[in-house]
From Swiss-Prot:
Compartments reported by the entry: Nucleus; Cytoplasm; Cytoplasm, Myofibril, Sarcomere
Descriptive protein name: Pyridine nucleotide-disulfide oxidoreductase domain-containing protein 1
Residues modified as N-acetylmethionine: M1
Signal peptide: none
Keyword Ligase in record: no
Broad class of enzyme this protein falls into: oxidoreductase
Family annotation (Pfam families): Pyr_redox_2 (PF07992), Rubredoxin_C (PF18267)
Source organism: Pongo abelii
Cofactor detail note: Binds 1 FAD per subunit.
Family recorded in the similarity comment: Belongs to the class-I pyridine nucleotide-disulfide oxidoreductase family. PYROXD1 subfamily.
Role summary: Probable FAD-dependent oxidoreductase; involved in the cellular oxidative stress response. Required for normal sarcomere structure and muscle fiber integrity.
Length: 500
């Protein structure tokens, strides 16, 4: 017979997921309820902690992500108990989760922060590698040391960073869009960055700031064996720092870009030989395309009919929310992207079950200048806000929507440039009646502003522009800027003086 649902006073606050959203949520709950035990359930032996947090402006924030052993988290917050195990099942009617180690944990409030997993272009192929967490990034480094040529499929943030960071290895980069970085940039910004790709890298590597913890060397008996298919937490900013991304050859950059195409078929060497297919050699400047005489472990046929051989393929084609362990027997409402739908208090469609980070899909009436993107900044903000909402609901208090959801704001680095994205930076969903204003100094900065009805709706800032705070304010207050015209981007005018 099914156990009766326990009263909501029974059980603990339980958070599932050791990534940025889960750890931030657990830390906030631990601070808010110092005398209560907070359970953090994670399949990984290391957790992701936010360090060196800096609030740059009202909404823009910068931080490092540090991998730490879970014991460090328990030392900082004595009321957090980390359970190193995957989740086998969620029994929402009984208010409990069953972990892979067979234990049941009753919750009064549960927050699911299990992240997302990479969409692999081909499952089960040993030559196809998805980069999502630290383990897969280290496996990639191991493979790269032996590689003469690799193929990168995808156009998101990880693909962009990889293409720039890899040295001493030919890279064929296949994207389905017309220009690189389609998620973040328009064609103009892409062109600005592409010139950096073509140039030889001169910047010396700066030693990485983060302490790296590996899972090797820990006593095996001290932790239960996790299933090998458990998904680790997403990589944080600067994830490639400290990884030696060098192939076998002695050159900096050799990149060939194939645009407007996708993967049609992947062949292993034997199959390729039997079919008597022909592949292209690495394209050289202005030379006619030649047949490759070298044999490769794996071959990729693209939808543009070109075939290239390589040592291995990196699949960087995005992620899907990691909802699978929680769906059986529960009637969650899911978003179009497969995420758990959450309302404006990070609450799912099930009682006392919240979600934050990559696993969730926002289903509230969004601010006109905010959109959900599965980025570290939003994982931190959602985890923090979910904890506040759980605390408020437990105490019977009401809580206002967090201000960070008023404006999309993200700061990162691509190709060694500082990149700030604000609001509808790519005119997402604005229709055709918007206009763009641009300022570009090759090799130094790229500034794009999205205007609609005289109001600033978004901006892309590449380089050290010092415009982020002013533009953030202009987007937030929706002031009519029609009278300023081109002066908005005139480098000889200190725009801050206008709006003091």
């Amino acid at each position: 017979m099914e156990a009766a649902r326990p009263p909501t006073t029974a059980g603990k606050f339980v958070v599932v997921g050791g990534g940025i959203a889960g750890v931030t949520c657990a830390e906030q709950l631990a601070t808010h309820f110092p005398s209560e035990d907070i359970l953090l359930v994670t399949a990984s032996p290391v957790i992701k902690a936010v360090t060196n947090f800096k609030q740059i402006s009202k909404i823009l924030e910068e931080f490092d992500v540090e991998e730490q052993s879970s014991t460090m988290l328990e030392k900082r917050f004595p009321n957090i108990k980390v359970i190193e195990s995957g989740v086998k099942q969620l029994k929402s009617e009984e208010h409990c989760i069953v972990t892979e180690d067979g234990n049941q944990h009753v919750y009064k409030k549960l927050c699911l922060c299990a992240g997302a997993k990479p969409k692999l272009i081909c499952e089960g192929n040993p030559y196809v590698l998805g980069i999502r967490d630290t383990d897969s990034a280290q496996e990639f480094q191991k493979q790269l040391i032996k590689a003469k040529r690799i193929m990168i499929i995808g156009n998101g943030g990880i693909a962009l960073e990889l293409v720039y960071e890899i040295e001493g290895c030919e890279v064929i980069w296949a994207i389905k869009d017309k220009a690189i970085g389609n998620t973040f940039f328009d064609a103009g910004a892409a062109e600005f960055l592409t010139s950096k790709l073509i140039a030889e890298k001169s910047e010396a590597k700066i030693a990485h700031k983060r302490t790296r913890y590996t899972t090797e060397g820990r006593k095996k008996e001290a932790r239960s064996k996790c299933k090998s298919d458990n998904v680790g937490s997403a990589l944080g900013p600067d994830w490639h720092e400290g990884l030696n991304l060098k192939g076998t050859k002695e050159f900096s950059h050799k990149i060939h870009l194939e645009t407007m195409c996708e993967v049609k078929k992947i062949y292993l060497q034997d199959e390729f030989r039997i079919l008597k297919k022909k592949s292209f050699s690495f394209p050289r400047d202005h030379k006619s395309v030649t047949t490759d005489t070298e044999m490769w472990p794996v071959y990729v046929e693209l939808t543009n009919e070109k075939i290239y051989g390589c040592d291995f393929i990196v699949s960087a084609t995005g992620v899907t929310p990691n909802v699978e362990p929680f769906l059986h027997g529960n009637s969650f409402e899911l978003g179009e992207d497969g995420g758990l739908k959450v309302d404006d208090h990070m609450h799912t469609s099930l009682p006392d079950v919240y979600a934050a980070g990559d696993i969730c899909t926002t289903a509230w009436q969004l601010s006109p200048v905010w959109q959900q993107m599965r980025l570290w900044t939003q994982a931190r903000q959602m985890g923090w806000y979910a904890a506040k909402c759980m605390a408020a609901a437990s105490s019977g208090d009401s809580i206002d929507m967090d201000f960070s959801f008023e404006l999309f704001a993200h700061v990162t680095k691509f190709f060694n440039y500082k990149v700030v994205l604000l609001g509808k930076y790519n005119a997402q969903g604005l229709g055709s009646d918007h206009e763009l204003m641009l300022r570009c100094t090759k090799g130094q900065e790229y500034v794009k502003v999205v205007m609609q009805n005289g109001r600033m709706m978004g901006a892309v800032l590449i380089g050290e522009t010092d415009l982020e705070e002013t533009f953030e304010n202009l987007i937030l207050n929706q002031m009519n800027l029609s009278s300023y015209g081109e002066d908005l981007l005139d480098p000889n005018i200190d725009i801050e003086d206008y709006f003091d």
